[in-house]
Amino acid sequence: MNYREDLEFQLQKVTLAIQEVVEDVYISDKVRQERIRKLLNFKETIIYKGRELRIDLEAA
């Protein structure tokens, strides 16, 4: 797996994790917002790393 594929895979995993948090009915809104915030920060980091390396990420 090359670096681009690795970043795309990580981006897909984060996107799925965000969706799972959104759909989780067993956590409070405060916890949900905190988890989403952390996952979005991680997603932005992955996208930034791709841009830094001049990699066009398809999942973004």
Model segments located where?
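N-terminal acidic leader/helix
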Residues: 1-33, 50-58
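Short amphipathic alpha-helical coiled-coil/interface segments
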Residues: 36-46
